[in-house]
C-alpha cells in the first residue's frame, strides 16, 4: 500500500509539477522517526540547522529555512497532538522560573497581535517563535535527562557549521577573502555575515573546551581541526560584533575561573560605569573624530567599530535605532506588533540620518538590536521581558554551575552560558531570534541551562 501511494505521489509530482508533494516521502520519514526515536530526531534538527537554506529565488518560495523550520513546525504539531492524546505536560520544566518568563514573554507577544499594525505578520512571527521554543526548549529539554543528548547538542551544531564554513571559505577564496564579498559568500546557508559570525562565536567556546577534555589522540586532532577552521572562519567573517562578543565571553570566563564573587563583580561594574560616565566627553570626541571605515585591513576594520562619523554600517545602525525609538514613542505600551518593524520604520527615518545603504523598502532587515527592536514592536514591556529572560538564563545557569559536581555537565553549563554571553552581547548590534540559525542555538542552550537548574548532580568525566 505504501509503495502504491508513493508511486502515485511521484506520478502527480512529475505530471503536474507540484513540487511541494515531493516532500511527502521526507515528511513520512520524519513522522516515523518522531514516533520511534524522538530524541535523535531533535538532535538531527540541531545538526541540520546550519545547513538549511531559504529558497527565495525559486518557484518553490515558502519563506522558510528548509528543512529545519519545516521540521521544527512539524515537531511542534507532533507535540500538540501528543498532548491531546496523552494529556501530559512537562511539569518539571514548567515549574521553573526561567520557563515561566519564556511563556509570559510569548503571551505578551500574542497579546500585542490585537494592537498590531499588521496582525497577520505578527501572528506569523509569534507562530514561528512557538515552533522554535517548543521543540528546542521544551522537547529537547526533556530529552536532556539523557546524558548522551546533552553531550551531543553542541558538537552536532558545530560540526555542521564547520561544513558551512568550508563552503564559505572556499567561495570567499575565489574573491581574495575581500571584506566586500564577505557579506554574502556564506549564502545559501547563512543569509549574511553577521548571522554567520553570531553562530561561529556561539559555538567557539565549546570548540575551545573540546580541545582540553580527556579524549583519544584521533578525537583531539579532529577537535583541533574544527577549532582552527572556526577560528579562520571567524576572522574572515569580518563580523566586528562577533569578535566583540567573544571578548565579553572571555571576560565572563575569567569571572568563573578566578571565582570572582557577586560583590566584587558589582564593585568592578560600578567603577567601570563611573569611569565611563566621568570620561564620556573624551570618548565622544574619540568616536566622532574617528574616520576609519571598515576595510580588508583587520586593524582598520576593528578601529572602524567606534566610527560614528563616516562608517556607513555604523551610521545605518544608528538610523535604525533612532527610528525604533521614535516608533516606541509613538506607541509606548503595546508597540507596532511583532515582526512589523521592517515594514513600518521608513516614515520614522530622518533625512539627516540616512546613509547610502538606507531604504524605505521592507526587505532590508530589522532594528539591529535584541533590545531596541522589542521596544518598538512590543512596547516597553517587550524590553522588560528581554531583560527578565536574560536575567533568568544567567541566574539559573550560574546557580547550576555552582551546584553541579566538576565534570562534563558542569563544563557544558559553562559553555552554554558563554554562548549566551556571545549572543546577547552581539544582540546589542543585531538580532536573530526570529530566525532558525539563532533561535536553535539560544533555546537549545537555554534548555541545557534549565535542565541543570533542576538537576541535583553532574556526571563526572
Where are the regions that the model predicts?
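Alpha-helical transmembrane segments of multi-pass inner-membrane proteins
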Residues: 1-13, 26-33, 76, 102-114, ...
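Membrane-interface anchor segments at the N-terminal boundary of transmembrane helices
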Residues: 2-23, 60-75, 373-390
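Membrane-interface helix caps and helix-loop-helix hairpins in membrane proteins
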Residues: 13-16, 58-62, 115-124, 235-236, ...
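A membrane-periplasm/extracellular boundary helix in multi-pass inner-membrane enzymes
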Residues: 15, 169-175, 232, 236, ...
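Membrane-interface micro-motifs in multi-pass membrane enzymes
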Residues: 16-20, 62-71, 124-128, 188-203, ...
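N-terminal hydrophobic segments of proteins, predominantly signal-anchor/transmembrane helices
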Residues: 32-125, 423
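Membrane helix-loop boundary segments at the extracytoplasmic
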Residues: 47, 53-57, 371-378, 411-451
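Long extracytoplasmic/lumenal interhelical loops at the membrane interface
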Residues: 178, 187, 307-322, 326, ...
Amino acid at each position: 500500500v505504501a509503495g502504491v501511494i508513493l508511486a502515485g505521489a511521484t506520478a502527480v509530482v512529475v505530471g503536474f509539477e507540484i513540487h511541494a508533494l515531493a516532500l511527502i516521502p521526507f515528511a513520512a520519514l520524519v513522522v516515523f522517526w518522531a514516533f520511534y526515536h524522538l530524541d535523535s530526531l531533535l538532535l538531527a534538527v540541531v545538526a541540520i540547522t546550519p545547513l538549511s537554506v531559504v529558497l527565495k529565488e525559486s518557484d518553490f518560495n515558502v519563506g522558510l529555512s528548509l528543512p529545519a523550520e519545516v521540521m521544527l513546525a512539524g515537531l511542534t504539531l507532533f507535540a500538540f497532538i501528543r498532548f491531546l492524546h496523552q494529556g501530559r505536560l512537562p511539569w518539571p520544566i514548567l515549574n521553573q522560573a526561567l520557563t515561566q518568563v519564556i511563556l509570559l514573554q510569548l503571551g505578551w507577544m500574542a497579546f500585542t497581535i490585537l494592537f498590531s499594525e499588521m496582525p497577520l505578520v505578527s501572528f506569523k512571527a509569534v507562530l514561528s517563535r512557538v515552533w522554535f521554543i517548543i521543540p528546542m526548549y521544551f522537547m529537547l529539554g526533556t530529552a536532556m535527562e539523557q546524558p548522551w543528548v546533552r553531550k551531543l547538542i553542541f558538537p552536532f551544531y558545530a560540526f555542521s557549521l564547520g561544513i558551512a564554513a568550508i563552503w564559505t571559505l572556499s567561495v570567499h577564496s575565489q574573491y581574495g577573502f575581500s571584506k566586500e564579498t564577505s557579506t554574502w559568500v556564506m549564502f545559501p546557508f547563512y543569509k549574511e555575515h553577521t548571522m554567520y559570525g553570531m553562530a561561529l562565536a556561539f559555538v567557539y567556546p565549546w570548540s575551545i573546551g573540546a580541545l582540553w577534555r580527556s579524549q583519544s589522540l584521533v578525537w583531539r586532532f579532529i577537535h583541533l581541526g574544527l577549532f582552527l577552521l572556526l577560528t579562520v572562519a571567524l576572522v574572515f567573517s569580518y563580523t566586528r560584533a562577533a569578535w566583540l562578543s567573544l571578548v565579553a565571553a572571555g571576560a565572563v570566563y575569567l569571572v568563573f575561573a578566578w571565582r570572582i564573587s557577586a560583590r566584587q563583580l558589582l564593585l568592578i561594574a560600578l567603577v567601570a560605569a563611573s569611569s565611563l560616565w566621568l570620561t564620556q566627553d573624551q570618548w565622544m570626541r574619540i568616536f566622532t573624530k574617528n574616520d576609519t571605515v571598515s576595510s580588508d585591513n583587520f586593524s582598520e576594520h576593528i578601529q572602524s567599530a567606534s566610527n560614528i562619523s563616516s562608517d556607513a554600517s555604523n551610521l545605518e545602525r544608528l538610523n535604525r535605532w533612532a527610528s525604533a525609538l521614535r516608533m516606541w514613542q509613538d506607541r509606548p505600551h503595546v508597540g507596532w506588533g511583532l515582526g512589523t518593524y521592517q515594514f513600518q520604520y521608513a516614515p520614522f527615518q530622518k533625512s539627516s540620518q540616512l546613509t547610502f545603504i538606507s531604504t524605505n523598502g521592507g526587505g532590508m532587515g530589522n532594528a539591529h538590536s535584541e533590545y531596541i527592536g522589542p521596544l518598538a514592536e512590543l512596547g516597553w514591556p517587550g524590553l522588560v521581558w528581554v531583560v527578565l529572560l536574560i536575567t533568568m538564563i544567567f541566574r539559573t545557569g550560574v546557580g547550576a554551575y555552582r551546584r553541579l559536581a566538576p565534570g562534563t555537565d558542569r563544563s557544558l553549563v559553562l559553555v552554554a552560558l558563554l554562548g549566551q554571553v556571545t549572543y546577547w552581547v552581539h544582540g546589542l548590534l543585531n538580532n536573530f531570534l526570529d530566525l532558525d540559525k539563532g533561535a536553535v542555538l539560544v533555546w537549545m542552550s537555554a534548555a541545557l541551562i534549565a535542565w541543570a537548574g533542576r538537576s541535583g548532580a553532574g556526571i563526572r568525566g
